[in-house]
Amino acid sequence: MTATDPAPTRPIWLADDKKRVQIIDQRMLPHNLVIVDLTTVDQVIEAIGEMMVRGAPLIGVTGAFGVFIAVQNALERGDFEAQVRKECLRIKEARPTAVNLAWGVDRVCAAVFSKTLPADCLAAALAEASAIAEEEVDNCRRIGVHGVGLIETISRQKGGKTVNVLTHCNAGWLACVEHGTATAPIYKAFEKRIDIHVWVDETRPLNQGARLTAWELGQRGVAHTVITDNAGGHLMQHGMVDMVIVGTDRSTYTGDVANKVGTYLKALAARDNNIPFYVALPSSTFDWEMTDGLAQIPIEERNPDEVRCVEGLCPDGRVEKVRIVPENSRAANYAFDVTPARLVTGFITERGVCGAGRDQVLALFPEKR
């Protein structure tokens, strides 16, 4: 399958045999569209750790289906419960920053151990994992419904002229299950025929913006321009950005936001230029225990080779990785940074838009008080 073939409408799904879980290997996009089967917990952990799947909601859904796979493979073992619990712990450790992973795994694990018969455990695992996936689809749909009003307001203020939105990394359907978080309001605006254009940060070192967000927007026909990571401030200074919408891998209910490294710099530039900076997320991405994002959210450090090397398409169609850093130079690869609540204009959630503060968030989610 190549990237010119009709694309799947989701990045993860259950195969027709109801045993295999299938994913898009997002490392291969945009040049090749590769589908991978997941049948073991080791494969699930590799898919998450190596970023075949990525994005907080999708990581949570993948972890949930990982528990289903763990149950399936443990059915014939005498130590069924111990084995499943061990595998659940392994899945939760695949990546540290996205809070959805532990949330999804724990939900399915609880459903499994509410049953006594192994066959019922398997059915419960599949039902709960599937429910989580569908909930995230609906959450993202509603994020779009609530967020599009912000874009409509700017469009009216500009007399129908183009609304320019800047986004960072990929918080589209590839990072979720459908719709996306940051892209959901954009897609909804496009459906409403609002004149909209998206500035897409390339998002070094793995270029999720250039590779994935640009590919997504192109598939939908949404006008977009890929820019270098450091160009956003310049565009803001010259009135070429109307708003910023990003996703998040973990946000505290007090308003601090962990997202792909570079997000903090965009928030600083937006504040300096009086540009609204919104974070789109489902409630599953809130950490309801943490109160200080900078001090408490774990920041993943990935392989330095991701910084030292870059992949690209050769004229003959081959995808090759080349080194761009001197051999004797060290590299550091912090995957995320934390944007403090004071720089965030608001959260766009499935329940509505609110300010980035404890009282505002809890007003939307009173059951978390």
UniProtKB/Swiss-Prot annotation:
Keywords: Amino-acid biosynthesis, Isomerase, Methionine biosynthesis. It catalyses: 5-(methylsulfanyl)-alpha-D-ribose 1-phosphate = 5-(methylsulfanyl)-D-ribulose 1-phosphate. It comes from the Bacteria. Pathway: Amino-acid biosynthesis; L-methionine biosynthesis via salvage pathway; L-methionine from S-methyl-5-thio-alpha-D-ribose 1-phosphate: step 1/6. The active site is at 249 (proton donor). It is an enzyme of class 5 (isomerase). Substrate binds at residues 54-56, 95, 208, 259-260. InterPro entries: IF-2B-related, IF-M1Pi, IF_2B-like_C, Initiation_fac_2B_a/b/d, M1Pi_N, NagB/RpiA_transferase-like. GO terms for biological process: L-methionine salvage from methylthioadenosine. GO terms for molecular function: S-methyl-5-thioribose-1-phosphate isomerase activity. Coiled coil: none annotated. Its EC number is 5.3.1.23. HAMAP family: Salvage_MtnA. Belongs to the eIF-2B alpha/beta/delta subunits family. MtnA subfamily. Catalyzes the interconversion of methylthioribose-1-phosphate (MTR-1-P) into methylthioribulose-1-phosphate (MTRu-1-P). This is Methylthioribose-1-phosphate isomerase. The lineage of its organism: Bacteria, Pseudomonadati, Thermodesulfobacteriota, Desulfobacteria, Desulfobacterales.
